[in-house]
Amino acid sequence: MSANLKYLSLGILVFQTTSLVLTMRYSRTLKEEGPRYLSSTAVVVAELLKIMACILLVYKDSKCSLRALNRILHDEILNKPMETLKLAIPSGIYTLQNNLLYVALSNLDAATYQVTYQLKILTTALFSVSMLSKKLGVYQWLSLVILMTGVAFVQWPSDSQELNSKELSAGSQFVGLMAVLTACFSSGFAGVYFEKILKETKQSVWIRNIQLGFFGSIFGLMGVYVYDGELVSKNGFFQGYNRLTWIVVVLQALGGLVIAAVIKYADNILKGFATSLSIILSTLISYFWLQDFVPTSVFFLGAILVITATFLYGYDPKPAGNPTKA
């Protein structure tokens, strides 16, 4: 049963990651009549959906009892204001990160984005060393060097980029790259900060996600007011929303829940395998379906290095199955 859950969670992760990147990219480049949907509002809606999903999961864990659900939410959130406030910092950073991903995929093709975004492995590792005093092995340090080399190859200018010059200017690609790099740093810091909180307390990951979603909604609404307030007052909060937009929002809302399931049922090596599959699928679909990406030999070399680094970082050279003596 656990093996089935392991591969099911990884399969869902591949589907969710690939689908989110491709649909978000397509939705931001699709030319339609009327105003385009506002990414700031999509981030808020995704946070609200995540809260609803987590409440349902807590309800399930409390044996489908509304009374038990109400008691848990009251005891774990309202009665522990300081514990809840701890999530304000990572929540604000995650909200910034989610907005940056929309900026990145508005300016970069899905394949380039997918590979470059794996730099979050590097930032997560560095923040883990500094904040959690985590020690990295030789294989992990080597994988980080390979990762940086691979991403550098992926971002290496090539003649094939001239084919996309009508769609993407050098300026917009620079904006996309800066958005991805900033998202990598924010993802690394927020992820390690969240891990530190989870390890220091006994609250469930679903309660913590509800707290994250609560602050995320507040920060997201502040972003809507500051950056898109005029457009919202003119055309409405849900301007430009269509079926594709809702698919993007739902996929983004499910992202954190899928990661939680993978952490629970799988391991780093299989998670790396899922990430690698997602990169390959994104590359193929970007080339054959979206037709906004022409892979080069340099890109393939970089992608192979990134995939290798992903596996190597999760590799444990210690033999498994030897029980420790008491």
From Swiss-Prot:
Main location: Golgi
InterPro entries reported for this sequence: Nuc_sug_transpt (IPR007271)
Chain ranges passing through the membrane: 4-24, 38-58, 136-156, 174-194, 212-232, 244-264, 269-289, 293-313
SUPFAM superfamilies linked to this entry: Multidrug resistance efflux transporter EmrE
Localization annotation: Golgi apparatus membrane
Any Pfam family: Nuc_sug_transp
UniProt-listed GO biological process terms: transmembrane transport; UDP-N-acetylglucosamine transmembrane transport
GO molecular function, one term: UDP-galactose transmembrane transporter activity
Keyword Transmembrane: yes
PTM remark: O-Glcnacylation regulates the stability of SLC35A3 and the specific complex formation with MGAT4B.
Membrane topology: Multi-pass membrane protein
Entry's Gene Ontology cellular component terms: Golgi membrane
Keyword Transmembrane helix: yes
Keywords: Antiport, Disease variant, Golgi apparatus, Membrane, Sugar transport, Transmembrane, Transmembrane helix, Transport
Catalytic activity: UMP(out) + UDP-N-acetyl-alpha-D-glucosamine(in) = UMP(in) + UDP-N-acetyl-alpha-D-glucosamine(out)
Pathological condition linked to this protein in its record: Defects in SLC35A3 may be cause of complex vertebral malformation (CVM) in Holstein.
SUBUNIT field: Interacts with SLC35A2; the interaction is reduced in the presence of SLC35A4. Found in a complex with SLC35A2 and SLC35A4. Interacts with MGAT4B.
Task of the protein: Transports diphosphate-N-acetylglucosamine (UDP-GlcNAc) from the cytosol into the lumen of the Golgi apparatus, functioning as an antiporter that exchanges UDP-N-acetyl-alpha-D-glucosamine for UMP. May supply UDP-GlcNAc as substrate for Golgi-resident glycosyltransferases that generate highly branched, multiantennary complex N-glycans and keratan sulfate. However, the exact role of SLC35A3 still needs to be elucidated, it could be a member of a catalytically more efficient multiprotein complex rather than function independently as a single transporter.
Family from the record: Belongs to the nucleotide-sugar transporter family. SLC35A subfamily.
Matches recorded under PANTHER family: NUCLEOTIDE-SUGAR TRANSMEMBRANE TRANSPORTER (PTHR10231)
Name of the protein this chain belongs to: UDP-N-acetylglucosamine transporter
Native species: Bos taurus
